[in-house]
Amino acid sequence: MKFTTEARADLARLDLQLARRVFNKLHRLVENFEFLVPEPLTGDWKGVYKLRIGDYRALYTFDKMQLLVHFIRHRREVYKIK
């Protein structure tokens, strides 16, 4: 799992408890990826997937070997980025 510069900054802005929750959920996604169905986005976000973490969303892409987290933002903000 890798994080973009934006995702690292997003994670750093969260309070410690929420940041741990986000990181743990992303880690579980990576560990159990073959058993989960990713939630794809549409429109301008085609090719990007979301992970719901309470009121927050992690937007990521993946290939066979790696998951790349692009953003971690509140649900009211995350889709307005592009």
Predicted regions and their residues:
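N-terminal processing/targeting junctions
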Residues: 24, 35, 65-66
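A short, surface-exposed loop/turn module that caps and links secondary-structure elements
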Residues: 27-51
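Enriched for short, Lys/Arg-rich terminal
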Residues: 2-9, 13-20, 53-56, 61-82
